[in-house]
Structures are given as C-alpha cells and as structure tokens.
From Swiss-Prot:
This protein's record includes keyword Hydrolase: yes
Entry-linked InterPro entries: AB_hydrolase_fold, FrsA-like, FrsA_esterase
Keywords of the record: Hydrolase
Highest taxon listed in the record's lineage: Eukaryota
Protein name according to UniProt: 20-hydroxy-prefusarin hydrolase FUS2
Signal sequence coordinates: none
The family this protein is said to belong to: Belongs to the AB hydrolase superfamily. FUS2 hydrolase family.
Enzyme Commission no: 3.7.1.-
Gene name per UniProt: FUS2
C-alpha cells in the first residue's frame, strides 16, 4: 500500500478522510494539498492544515448557496464538517484545549447546514437519557424514489472510541439512503458533543445507553415516520462494533452488524506491551506509579501512544494510564456474553489492522455466538486496503456498504430486481 505519511498513525487518519471522497466527505485535491502542509508526527501542523481547509470548503459552500447551487453547497458543507472534525482529532492529548470544542461545534454547524440540502429527509432530535440529560440524534429517511415497499427498514448506528455523529454519516446513511433504508444515528456518552460539552464519559455497559435510545425510537420516532421495527438493525465499527454487540442482546434489535470490533480491549492492549511489564503491573510487582512513569516517558517519544492514552483518559474520565487500563479490563465480551445474542449477526474483521486483528477478535467473536445457527451468523474478513482490510474498513466504505446491505437485504427478506 502506498503511504502518504511514514507514520502509520498519521497515514491511517489521512486515509480515514480520503476514504470518504465517494460520499462527498472530502476532495482528493484538497486532501493532497493539505497533506503537503502537514509535518509527519506533528499534531499542531495537522490541526492548522485541516482547519484552513475546512474554512476554504465552508467558503465554497457559502458561495454556492449564494447563487442557489444546492448540490454544490451541500457537498462543500459536508466536506467542511469532515475537515473540522479531523482538525481537532489529534489535539486530544490535552482535552481542555479550547480549539477542540470550537472545531467540534464548527463541524456540527457545517453538517447541519449540509444535511438540509441532501436528497433525503433528515430530522434532528434530543434523546432523553438520564434525568435531564439528552443525547443528540439524527434520523435519515430515504427520498420517495428510493423507498422500498411497506414500512421503512432502519439501521440504528452507534459510534465508537473516537468517532462523531457527523462522521458516522459516511459509514451508514450515505450507503443506506439510496438503498431504501433509514438510519438513526446518535452520539452517546464519551462521544461527540456529549463528551465535549456535557463531559459525559463512556459507559462500558453500552446496552443501557442503547436501551434508552431504543425507547425513544420505538415510542416516539417509529410511528410518525413509518419505521419498520421488525426490520431494525444495529451497526457499529471498531469499538462501535463491540458496543453494537453489547446492545444486540436487546430483543428489539432484529439484526446486528459488528464491523471490526474487539473481543477484549485490555487483552489487545496487553499484547502490545512487554509481557514482563504488563504482567508485573497485574501482579502488583510494578506499582501504578512506576507504570504511569514508564508510559509517560514513552508518550514523550511516541505520539501515537501519547494520543491513545490521552484520548483514553478523556473518554473514560480517568487521570492516569493505569486507570485507563482498568477501564479497558471492563470492555470485554468474554464470559459468555456473546451467547446471549439471539438476532442474526454479521461479524467483520480486518486482516491488515494494526489495532484489532481477526485472530484474537473477529474469529473468536464469531465462534462465541453459540445461540445462533450457521445460517444466522456470517463472518467476513476484509483483506487489503481495497477490500476492507484496514481497521473499520477505512478506504473501502463502498465495499462495506455493499457487504452490509446485501446481508441485511437477505436477513430482512428484501428482494431487488436483477439489473
């Protein structure tokens, strides 16, 4: 695979943007020009370059809107939203940096201006969560000429460790709408604005979060918008793949797509550390103080490690690297949890992932679905960047759309004419 950046981390995040080009999330020329302004491994240059490109895309959107170019304005606003999202992404080592919230709000604002111009109906909602807390959600409905017969099948889309609801559009709604599916996406605790504004931390029992969202969808949304609750699926990618499996035990979910999710987040992190060091910490031989000192020393020379632990502390609401690992120990599907899933399930893996390799994730997850027959569960391992081999199918979103909706069509008995 050709690399734009020598750093695997920077290259992956660049491809994350570039991969949205087919769905108006970026322009190739804009991305290549922006990449030329970034110093590999330097998050400040990354922020400045994508901020500048976001401003340029937003200016193009406003120029198009001023002359009545609906399509041009829509596409440019959506690109601007994605560039704003990317700009603040590598600043998460210091969550109190005011640029994070400013760029996040700019991303949401640009996306809100873009979706009203889509060839679809999009509605924004506030989902009752806990007490007076509400979560942001969006319902995407297919245009009349894309409608399938009967009620509208719907995909409930959950984010993951570092996504925002605006980015989820490219993974879900962009592929669902022209195929006649509705999508309901949301940002939960530890994600998007609930993290940045509400300071809500990620919950490891994500099934609780989704139960609140499902209450809202089934009671308030489905009747008004003709959603088919007998054809309701959940979809999540990367950590979202894990979260979707946590939620799939709810009987209201009729199908689950878990894209490249982990089986046990702590065991994955453990496998990337020297065994004597992590085992010493687990046994108490290595103290928290020493563990934290070593990790902090590594973050000074390895930006990827710095970002992963910095973002982890923020999302999990903890103060030290040792505490990050303690939360990770709770993020596991072991112990029989997978046997509780009764709905048809598609598991995907990424053969070339440097995060969640299939041998210790997708494969054992698939085998753990013991309540499902061979015709109720399916495993797909993507290979190569062009075939969905990178984590979360980065660079192959059209491929994952095809695989996912072909499987959902079969699961929900949706028939289409041969072309």
């Amino acid at each position: 695979m050709h690399k734009v950046f020598a750093s695997d981390f920077f290259n992956f995040e660049f491809l994350r943007l570039l991969g949205t080009v087919p769905f108006q999330g970026a322009e190739v020329g804009e991305c290549l020009t922006t990449a030329g302004r970034i110093k590999d491994g330097d998050p400040e240059s990354w922020y400045r370059a994508w901020r500048d490109q976001a401003e340029k895309a937003q200016a193009l959107a406003e120029e198009a809107a001023a002359v009545g170019d609906r399509t041009g304005a829509c596409w440019a606003y959506i690109r601007a939203a994605n560039y704003w999202r990317a700009s603040e992404f590598l600043l998460h080592c210091t969550p109190n940096d005011p640029r994070i919230l400013a760029a996040s709000k700019a991303s949401v604002n640009a996306f809100d201006k873009g979706w009203v111009l889509l060839d679809a109906t999009v509605k924004s909602f506030e989902i009752p969560y806990d007490k007076d807390i509400k979560l942001p959600g969006r319902l995407y409905l297919p245009a009349p000429h894309h409608r399938l017969p009967g009620k509208i099948p719907v995909v409930l889309q959950t984010g993951g460790f570092d996504s925002t609801q605006e980015e989820l559009y490219f993974y879900g709604a962009a592929g669902a709408l022209p195929r006649g599916y509705a999508v309901f996406s949301f940002d939960g605790p530890g994600q998007g604005l609930p993290l940045r504004v509400g300071k809500l931390k990620l919950r490891t029992d994500w099934e609780y979060v989704v139960s609140q969202v499902l209450d809202f969808v089934t009671d308030d949304i489905a009747p008004e918008y003709d959603l088919d609750l007998e054809r309701l699926a959940i979809f999540g990618a990367s950590l979202g793949g894990y979260l979707s499996l946590r939620a799939a035990v709810d009987p209201r979910i009729k199908a689950c797509i878990s894209c490249d999710g982990p089986l046990d987040l702590f065991e994955i992190t453990r496998s990337r550390m020297p065994s004597w060091f992590i085992n010493g910490w687990l046994s108490g031989w290595v103290s928290d103080g020493l563990f934290n000192w070593v990790v902090d020393a590594l973050t000074a020379v390895n930006f990827q490690i710095a970002w992963e632990f910095g973002h982890g502390k923020w999302v999990f609401g903890v103060e030290t690297p040792a505490d990050v690992l303690r939360v990770m120990q709770q993020i596991s599907l072991k112990g029989g949890y997978l046997s509780k899933i009764k709905c048809p399930t598609l598991i995907t893996g990424a053969a070339d992932s440097f995060y969640f390799t299939p041998d210790i994730n997708a494969n054992p997850i698939f085998e753990g679905l013991t309540a499902l027959g061979s015709n109720e569960k399916h495993l797909w391992i993507g290979k190569g960047v062009e075939g969905g081999g990178l984590q979360a199918k980065i660079g192959a979103l059209a491929v994952v759309h095809h695989k996912m909706f072909t499987w959902l069509d079969s699961t929900f008995a949706i028939k289409r004419d041969v072309l």
